[in-house]
């Protein structure tokens, strides 16, 4: 809780204490044993948080790691995460679907143009997204898209992904 009379420093201190209390020893050990820094894990978790309604975080995490770490051209992704939520972070007044012009936006948060992670988290992720970033599913997925059923559909290859996107099941 925040009270009248609390300043920004009080609020920040409370947020930090809350974060530290939730990032327990087990989670911190997982971070230390990973090849990613705490900031990178939280950045990945923030991408997961903004990309899903909470039903498929571990699969979204798998796609992110596969694109970051995959071999060769990473199934045609070349290390580009191509995450809409990060682009929308760079375009806070954007409405409607993302266009090809939007994908040309000059911003470090445009993961259609910049390989790897954005420079900072794009949101404050919940524990479920942090846990997914620490424990992604082991898959060969490199792509996902939202279906008309409201669920993400995952693909291993660009051909599979394009077939889904061009089907009547694609939800945009």
For each feature predicted by the language model, list its residue ranges.
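Bacterial extracytoplasmic/cell-wall-associated proteins, especially those involved in peptidoglycan
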Residues: 1-172
